Amino acid sequence: TVFIDAVDGSLARLVHVKSVLPKIDGALLDNIVDYLNYVITPCFFLLVKPGMLPADYVVPITAAITITSAYQFCQDDAKTPDHFFKGFPCYWNITVFYMYIFNTSMIVNTVLLSLFCVLIFIPVKYVYPSRLDYLTESRVLKILMHCCSALYGISSFCLLVNYPETNKLWVSLSLGYVGMYLFLSFYRTYYPMFKAKITANNKD
């Protein structure tokens, strides 16, 4: 589903779906499907899979995820005009995937899921993997980023197929992409602020 979500918008724009079907709101349908795949499905997994969360916290945590995610999806600027996600972009399926693969403890899972619920309200600009125009103007870097995204998908799929064994190469590639994604997101959020502040100080 992550792969489909990564390419469906690009394919729709490629074939000009909005022009062919002007009365169909593809963005609305995309949000409905995304909420089901990224929020409801992982919450259901947390509810039915033993050992993911302490028994007393399963319902409160899954409720917090669904409510904060609903808030995120309802924001008219959840996707910014320059094609970034504002706040943690509800990657709950990816989060739960890693918790399952690495068999993290229930306490760690509870803390991380609670933290990510809070991060929804923190206006960090997270990279939109299929919309890179405002991340870089370099065509080479855009192609490289798409290749990295594809490699991430392959490595994560291999981790799932080989579970419970964990291959160091696939782990490194998968987590390396996550690290790069977070770095680019925080860099793109805070570097312009620091740059503007330095420029303003120099003018003074």
Positions of the model-derived regions?
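Short, motif-level signal for alpha-helix interfacial/capping segments enriched in acidic residues
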Residues: V7-L14, A64-S69, L159-T166
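C-terminal membrane-associated helical module and adjoining short loops/tails
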Residues: F85-D204
